[in-house]
Amino acid sequence: MILISQAYVFNKIWEIKTKNKSYLKCLLKYWTSHLWIKKNFQSFLSNQGIVGSLELQNFKEENWKEWLKGFNRYNFSSKEWYKITPQQWRNKVSEHWKNQENKKLNPNQQISKNNFFINTSILEQTKKRNKIFKQNLLTYSCFDFTKNLAIRNFLNLNRKKIYNNIIINKIQKSYFIYNKKAKYLDFFSQKQNIFFEYNLLLWLIPEFIEEKNQYQNKRILILKNSIIKENNKKIIQNQKLFRKRELNQSIRQWRWKSKSLEKKFKKLGNMASLMTFMQNQENIISLSSKMREDLKLFHLFFRRNTTINQLTINSEHRLARLLDDQILMYKMVSTFLNIKYRFKRLSNLDNFDDFLGIQFFENKEKNNFFFFNSFNLEDILLPKRRRKFRILNSLTSKNKKNTQLNQKFVQKKFSKTKIKKIKRFIWASYRFEDLACMNRFWFNTINGSRFSMLRFRMYPSLLT
């Protein structure tokens, strides 16, 4: 199909002549005289899209070339452009094919880039998680060096063939349960178990790890004194209470479904009660005539098909169980006694005084004394326990019995030797860099936003 521009069409029309006059010339001569031709021609040209913004008053024989400039120019074919400007034609053709090749190649490049980005991100995540896991193992082994068996058992599990057929969606931290007494364990199901938990000092180290979904079947180990069993006990108790409630006596009551029904039945009941007390026949006849008007009610409400449930609602309720006065008094007094006993138990510090006095001052063994004075226990404890420890320590210092300390004994036992200084400086809780690393791995923070959560001392105070 050959494309022809509007200018080309008008030029051809202009060249057509009949009696040495073109159609357009004849039309333009009679343009002003015949207005109806002007309007029809203008509407036709506007519908065809030939005339838009141009005014037809300027459409004359003299300036027809200027009028033709307002139309779209003729688009030559590629062969004609090759004859006119061969170099420009070649450049445009090469640009056209280059753009098409780039469009085809770009999606593949983007896909490959995205795949590479995904793979690199997963590898980085795995490296980070492994690094975090190693750091946690090291820190836990420092604090709980006596229970190395749990860590060894966990490390040896990878040698088994259980993990070959398991697919896990995400990289997850596994838990390990270590308990020497197998009596206290109950197997919830007979499927394979991949649920581990560290049995570490939770009083010293908080647990921030959450459980995540896994695709494989699990065997859950439940202790006898666990929360799950307590919940089961509560359910059984609730079932027993529900059975006791069902045994209590109940009062049955029927309630009308609507107030209009209730009013109509009251009318009928009142009329029937009056009929029993009346003796005169005239009054009975007058009442019966009134009741005939309401006989439709009897037909509606007392049919064979109608039942009581269609007209009324059962609103029965059980009687409450009577409580003795002694039970109420016991419950009221027991709460008060429990609160009083709890306050007394918290305020009683005799046991703590004895324990701290023995460990800090009265015990003259070298190892125990060195353990409590060479390391700062506040750095290991949690914030809540740290406050308690400080309060108890301040209370014990007021005791005269425990403050009697022989300074000469301390000077003899603890001299400023190089070995002790090196040991205390190398210990992780006193090094600024190690604490920063522990903060990053435990609280998952790269910057120092939560660095205040860990209290540290750059250099510990040495005994003089």
UniProtKB/Swiss-Prot annotation:
One of its GO terms (cellular component) is chloroplast. It is found in: Plastid, Chloroplast. Keywords: Chloroplast, Plastid, Protein transport, Transport. The keyword Lipoprotein does not apply. Its main location: plastid. One of its GO terms (biological process) is protein transport. It comes from the Eukaryota. Involved in protein precursor import into chloroplasts. May be part of an intermediate translocation complex acting as a protein-conducting channel at the inner envelope. Part of the Tic complex. Belongs to the TIC214 family. This is Putative protein TIC 214 C-terminal part. It comes from Marchantia polymorpha.
